[in-house]
Regions:
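Coiled-coil dimerization/phosphotransfer module
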Residues: 1-123
Length: 123
């Protein structure tokens, strides 16, 4: 480990959607994000990690982006906790994707939850 500082940012534009998740769903989502951050630190040599939570048409969209070395397709298929992230996402009926950031650098892990995962407001 290099001991280099990592800048990290949390952008919550979800309008409180995370507060309405069922506890098991929230825990699974937390674990996926935790694994994505760990991968960025351990394998991607990232200097910056950004977690973004957004309300996208009534569905929670979570993105974990880093500015690291990126990940080739082979690495996506084997190890790095990716199977665990995929499985956790499947268990909460979320879509899961790994791709390069839109600017071509680093990696972006995307989790998109379906609308039925939220408890009603005031419920």
């Amino acid at each position: 480990e290099s001991g280099a500082a990592i800048e990290w940012f949390l952008e919550d534009q979800s309008d409180g959607m995370t507060d309405r998740l069922e506890e098991t769903v929230a825990t699974s989502l937390f674990r996926i994000v935790q694994e994505a951050i760990n991968n960025a630190i351990r394998h991607a040599l990232a200097g910056e990690i950004r977690v973004r939570l957004r309300d996208k048409g009534g569905r929670l969209l979570v993105e974990v982006m880093d500015d690291g070395i990126g990940m080739d397709r082979q690495a996506q298929r084997i190890g790095h906790g990716i199977d665990n992230m995929r499985t956790r996402a499947r268990l909460i009926s979320a879509s899961f994707a790994i791709r390069k950031n839109t600017d071509g650098s680093g990696t972006c892990v995307t989790i998109h939850l379906p609308p039925e995962m939220y408890e009603p407001i005031g419920g």
